[in-house]
Regions:
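Membrane-embedded alpha-helical bundles of multi-pass transporters/translocases
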Residues: 2-467
């Protein structure tokens, strides 16, 4: 008689869920400091790099930033080791990642404009290359750790919770401790060293609490050029990219602008941070509770419109506390919507691709999305610095001494382009097709297909499928 193998429900241990989520937040924490406006502020305000040269750095960096994600994804997918395809990059890349981060804040001697330009460019190139290697591996680890959506979802819940920390630190802590021109930066630099060592330690140690299952790809994928073509002939994906580019641009620009805003605009910070926090929590509760009723499309249109109105409120009335509090409240709704709704919309876009091609191609879409949206980070930095230069911002002045024109430049550079882009998204989303009864029927059919594929695959590995 043939022996029957007992099937068990797939389960991701609690410590594994916490470890990968903490590693994800730690990796993002360093990126939010070095890869955002914090490093730009440090180089232009404290070290004295000309804002126009800093803008050129970000433009050059943007070219590399657009292609290194798909390039590393290609290399990572073909890595073979006893630890797996992803863990070696996370574990052994973490110490080098820390060194690259710390090097960003070293005040090297003879800081001429040319030297500062090269320093910032090399720091960004080295840091982001290591960030890509580690962050990409962490991003796909939930898919290496579990097969079933039910098991994976237990990881994603914790990732959302931990994502609050890399968002909050640049917005709240950095404006308090960052040095202005002529001020002593020793404490600030040691704080950054501590961040680099601490976050890298979390990333490194996390790899001992989870492991890859080494599942092989079950479906034959399309050739590269055909796969690329299928992405760009998927109309919902094009509309999604307009939104995705905008969200990356806006989040980068707003987190950069707040550093300059509190330096020069005489508005109390605490009430604004409270309004932002209330907006984040309130927006998350709102969208979680209303998503089923409104759907992703309507929720996204509401979010982009409110986010846009918040930008224009700060643009017009950013020197006054109450309207700025309203604007920050709308910023919070926008940030929470970006964290919660964008991944759901991305999932619908991939579902539509599966409906068209019969294949599940999250990896290809992630690579193409990075290729399109990564330049948004550089664009946000460069455009903000361009506005500062045009309005006469003087990087040599101490905090609070800029002219009225420079203050206006901060408000314009901080909120004008984000507000316009978000309103454009509100309009473009009118033509987003993945909504309504027909789309729900397609989703229902795909759900049945997924369940059958998942059942067969899990049972072939000895796991019991659970609804």
């Amino acid at each position: 008689m043939a022996q029957t193998t007992a099937l068990r429900e797939e389960f991701v241990p609690f410590q594994s869920r916490i470890a990968i989520s903490a590693a994800d937040a730690a990796c993002a924490m360093l990126q939010s400091l070095a890869g955002s406006g914090v490093l730009t502020y440090y180089f232009t305000r404290w070290r004295g790099l000309d804002p126009d040269l800093a803008a050129i750095v970000w433009i050059l960096f943007g070219i590399w930033n657009a292609v290194n994600d798909p390039l590393f994804g290609y290399i990572s997918d073909r890595t073979r080791s006893g630890l797996g395809r992803r863990i070696p990059y996370i574990r052994f890349g973490a110490p080098i990642y820390a060194l690259a981060f710390i090097a960003c804040w070293v005040n090297w001697p003879a800081p001429s404009q040319a030297v500062l330009f090269v320093e910032m460019l090399l720091a960004l190139f080295l840091f982001d290359s290591l960030y890509t290697a580690i962050a990409t591996s962490i991003y796909v680890m939930p898919f290496e750790m579990a097969v079933s959506n039910k098991a994976r979802s237990t990881i994603f819940v914790w990732k959302i919770i931990f994502s609050v920390f890399p968002l909050a630190v640049p917005l709240v802590l950095i404006p308090i401790i960052q040095p202005g021109p002529g001020e002593d930066a020793t404490g600030y630099q040691w704080t950054m060293v501590a961040f680099g060592i601490g976050m890298a330690a979390i990333i490194f140690l996390s790899t001992f609490f989870y492991k890859e299952k080494h599942y092989q790809q079950a479906e034959q994928q399309l050739p590269f050029l055909k796969a690329l073509k299928e992405c760009f002939t998927n109309r919902p994906f094009i509309i999604f990219e307009v939104l995705s580019f905008t969200i990356i641009y806006v989040q980068t620009g707003l987190m950069q602008g707040v550093l300059y805003y509190f330096d020069e605009i005489n508005v109390p910070a605490l009430p604004l941070y409270i309004a932002l926090a209330v907006g984040i929590v309130g927006g998350l509760v709102l969208f979680i509770n209303r998503r089923e009723t409104w759907g992703v499309k309507k929720s996204m249109r509401i979010m982009t419109l409110l986010f846009s109105l918040g930008c224009f409120a700060v643009l017009l009335f950013g020197r006054h506390m109450l309207p700025t509090m309203l604007g920050m409240f709308c910023f919070g709704i926008g940030f929470s919507g970006g964290m919660y709704l964008v991944p759901l919309m991305n999932g619908d876009v991939v579902d539509m691709d599966e409906q068209r091609t019969g294949l599940r191609r999250e990896g290809m879409y992630a690579g193409v999305n990075s290729f399109i949206t990564k330049p948004a980070i550089s664009a946000a930095q460069a455009v903000f610095l361009w506005f500062l230069a045009r309005f006469g911002y003087d990087t040599t002045l101490a905090k609070g001494l800029q002219s009225a024109s420079a203050e206006t430049g901060i408000l314009v550079g901080w909120t004008l382009v984000p507000g316009l882009l978000l309103f454009l998204c509100f309009v473009v989303l009118h033509w987003y097709p993945l909504a309504g009864p027909e789309w729900e029927r397609i989703k229902a059919r795909l759900s049945v297909v997924h369940a059958e594929k998942e059942r067969a695959y899990l049972e072939s590995k000895g796991y019991r499928y659970v609804e």
